[in-house]
């Protein structure tokens, strides 16, 4: 007989109840199914309709193409940082933003773990080399903010390194903004059952299974640790120069369209169609740590 498959069942406490979750079981537990959208006090009980989403997104993507023409004509620079828990929808939001932009002038940066050489450098150094030049739009799928979340939670940095990061980051970002880079920082926030449902979907899908790692499974039992680090990060790195934009992302469709609206409304580009952009849903998108309180 072959080696017995490793069990990946975890025990987690949600809402004061101890739950057992086996990600390898093809059946999603009822307690997850019931709250996969409403988890974390999400303000809607239904997802945005597909037809409404498709029409809205297309109009917003037309505006993003205008932004790119404006960047090339003026030499302006835009940089957007996408952060959030695992399975928060960062990649999908980036794709929706980037889909129709010219890849010569719009880049997605998704760095792997640092090399031995990079570990010996100044922490920010490997990120700075990817910052935009004149006319570019750069989107970071995770960023230097790894040091505010996953690294301290999983023990990949020391407490002193984490503390120093929270002090140094506002100074660095202030320099970027003063150098006329348009900097956007997005935190995509999801509920606990939402994350579990998305992990389960990845595990059961032959097309998405590569997205799920053992570290993701380990993170299921560290929800409160990640929450504490999230709150500390938002509190200490939300500044007038480089504010955090928080997006409730249980519904990926609402998250994406409101995130893109925020970018478009903040930029003074030629041909801007205010009616096509529409209004931001203030139940979905807000500013800084107070939005989650």
UniProtKB/Swiss-Prot annotation:
A GO BP term here is: ATP biosynthetic process
- UniProt keyword Kinase present: yes
EC number, as in UniProt: 2.7.4.-
Instruction: Recite the UniProt keywords alphabetically.
Output: ATP synthesis, Kinase, Transferase
Query: Which Pfam family name is an example for this entry?
Result: PPK2
Asked whether the keyword Hydrolase is assigned, the reply is: no
The free-text function statement in the UniProt record for this protein reads: Uses inorganic polyphosphate (polyP) as a donor to convert ADP to ATP.
Similarity remark: Belongs to the polyphosphate kinase 2 (PPK2) family. Class I subfamily.
Name of the protein in question:
ADP-polyphosphate phosphotransferase
Q: Which organism is it from?
A: Agrobacterium fabrum (strain C58 / ATCC 33970) (Agrobacterium tumefaciens (strain C58))
